[in-house]
UniProtKB/Swiss-Prot annotation:
Belongs to the adenylyl cyclase class-3 family. It comes from the Bacteria. Residues 12-127 form the Guanylate cyclase domain. Pfam families: Guanylate_cyc, TPR_12, TPR_16. This is Putative adenylate cyclase 3. It comes from Rhizobium meliloti (strain 1021). One of its GO terms (biological process) is intracellular signal transduction. The lineage of its organism: Bacteria, Pseudomonadati, Pseudomonadota, Alphaproteobacteria, Hyphomicrobiales.
Length: 587
């Protein structure tokens, strides 16, 4: 290499490497590679951008990143490991991508866009000394960051490392060590058991012999959760939190403690041609004892009848008395066209992928469902959700006409079956975005009447009350939603917003920071944190979080928020952002 082309500078270097990557590749090469690339794109790259770093080399299962600031490098390393832990939460241990991360400060040589020298080499060696899921840093880095960050490192002594003459003094940190977590974001205490019978339905195992049929087992589970949720005498954990255990074999008593329920339903689904076999068993999570087990073997056209039987068995076993309205709604729903049901279930999975392409695919499937069975209210409601989601995210050429379309589809769902809660829920959402808050409030209240365990409906009503300026009521509704869906990070965001509006800044900060641990790419949560810090005089932190907002979403616009968020009193939005101005942020 030509001498004149080499420049030198001091830099902080972050080295990250996947633990046991060769073993993962041997097990499933395609899925492992796809997952790693997704983690780099969706987790690593946004965090590097937020912390003003630059990825300068990829090494198959690892990356090297340059930072101009030691503090930025260390905070990025910790945020990366916290985000990876959250991303791995729903994966079996033998499929999770776990990283080791090392950070070093040293002199580097620069040629074109690549970096060389001891500064880089030591970072790579230090990385190997980190615990899986943890961070190791050199003594030089520690001198710079000590007292400048909330992350507490443990002195791990001197280590001999390959090809480095002198022993290296390292310090280590792991998000698994609760004692080392930054203050204000400790884990939430486990929830208490409700007074009424409480249950969580874990994802049913797919026993069909075809992994591609996993969506069908998920659909059966979701339908059973939905049916149980409509029973006012039960407390039923929402789908998001139940599905946090998908692909795992958790201890039922641990699930019971984590979700705060007494009973847990688990089972399996086997589908062959147009036949279906469901095995289900209910367990007392406080003792681990089995209460009952049953097998259902039917034609696929009787799937609704099977789901009704499962629900009825649970209700009877727990001695829950149905109201007159619930008894009426429990009447047989008759047979279903197998193709229509299959498409309906697949469309739900597509919607959950939450991108423009999957939104288009879900819409196509739902239109086919309604061609087969125009009376399927859930399909109309799902189409309404898609129209709204496209509008909010500006997908698929969305325009304000999407709101009118969403409103019409929600009304069609209600006209088709007025007892279908999702129709009223989607009507509430559409009316909210159209700034018709009083009408939206009535629709959300009706959704809760029909589905008293719907975390989504409580969140919708809470959001409406928040926009109406009724923040105490909103907070109570968000808290109720979070109890029903304790693993869903967005409810923490909404709780934080209500607390911020109420001036309860310390509690709001805790909620927002807990949310960022679970959703590290959220621009909106960072925006509200920046507003909070501005209003409480912590102006440097406010400016820092505002920079992070733009790092995650360069097109973020406060003016767009003013136009889109339907606050009944526009001064509520002014009050939110005044702290940013006080911090010197140009908006």
């Amino acid at each position: 290499m030509a001498k004149e082309s080499i420049r030198r500078r001091l830099a902080a270097i972050l080295a990250a490497d996947a633990v046991g990557y060769s073993r993962l590749m041997e097990r499933d090469e395609k899925s492992t590679h796809t997952l790693l690339m997704a983690r780099w794109k969706e987790v690593l790259e946004p965090l590097v951008g937020i912390h003003q770093g630059r990825v300068f080399k990829r090494t198959g299962d690892g990356v090297l990143v340059e930072f101009g600031s030691a503090v930025n490098a260390v905070e990025c390393a910790a945020a990366l490991q916290q985000a990876m832990a959250a991303a791995n939460r729903d994966l079996p241990e033998d499929r999770a991508i776990v990283l080791r991360v090392g950070v070093n400060l040293g002199d580097i040589m620069v040629e074109d866009s690549d970096l060389f020298g001891d500064g880089v080499n030591v970072a790579a060696r230090i990385e190997a000394l980190a615990d899986p899921g943890g961070v190791a840093i050199s003594d030089g880095i520690h001198e710079y960051v000590h007292g400048r960050t909330d992350i507490d490192f443990v002195d791990s002594g001197y280590h001999e490392v390959k090809n480095i003459e002198r022993p290296v003094h390292i310090w280590t940190w792991s998000p698994k060590d609760r004692a080392r977590e930054p203050p204000n974001i400790a884990a939430e205490p486990p929830p208490q058991l409700p007074a009424k019978p409480s249950i969580a339905v874990l994802p049913f195992d797919n026993m069909s012999g075809d992994p591609e049929q996993g969506y069908f087992a998920d659909g059966i589970t979701e339908d059973i959760i939905t049916d149980l949720s409509k029973v006012s005498g039960l407390f039923v954990i929402a789908r998001n939190s139940s599905f946090a255990y998908k692909g795992k074999t958790p201890d039922i008593r641990k699930v019971s403690r984590e979700l705060g329920v007494r009973y847990v339903l688990e089972g399996s689904v086997r589908r062959a041609a147009n036949r279906i076999r469901i095995n289900a068993q209910m367990i007392d999570g406080t003792t681990g004892g089995h209460l009952w087990a049953e097998r259902y073997d039917r034609g696929l056209e009787d799937i609704f009848a099977v789901q009704d039987e499962v629900t009825r068995t649970i209700v009877n076993a727990l001695r829950v008395k149905l109201t007159a309205g619930e008894e009426e709604r429990r009447e047989s729903r008759g047979k279903v066209d197998p193709e229509a049901y299959d498409l309906l279930v697949r469309s739900r999975q597509a919607i959950l992928q939450f991108n423009a392409l999957s939104s288009m695919e879900a819409r196509r499937m739902l239109h086919r469902v309604l061609e087969i069975d125009p009376g399927m209210a859930a399909a109309h409601a799902s189409l309404s959700i898609i129209a709204l989601t496209d509008f909010i995210n500006q997908w698929n050429g969305a325009t304000p006409d999407n709101l009118t379309q969403a409103l019409g589809l929600a009304q069609e769902a209600i006209d088709t079956d007025g007892s279908e809660p999702q129709g009223h829920y989607t009507l509430a959402l559409a009316l909210s975005w159209m700034r018709r808050l009083d009408e939206a409030e009535h629709a959300a209240e009706r959704a809760i009447e029909l589905d008293p365990n719907s975390a989504n409906a409580y969140t919708a009503l809470g959001t409406i009350r928040d926009f109406q300026g009724r923040h105490e009521e909103a907070l109570a509704l968000y808290t109720r939603a979070h109890r029903l869906d304790p693993q869903f990070d967005l409810s923490l965001h909404f709780q934080g917003r209500a607390l911020l509006n109420l001036g309860r800044f310390d509690e709001a900060e805790v909620a927002f920071k807990r949310r960022l641990l679970l959703a590290p790419r959220s621009d909106m949560t960072r925006f509200y944190l920046a507003c909070l810090y501005g209003r409480t005089g912590r102006h440097e932190e406010a400016r820092g979080y505002w920079r992070e907002v733009l790092g995650v979403n360069p097109s973020f616009s406060v003016d767009h928020l003013r136009r889109s968020l339907p606050y009944q009193d526009p001064h509520l939005m002014d009050r939110l952002v005044e702290g940013l101005r006080e911090a010197g942020v140009s908006i």
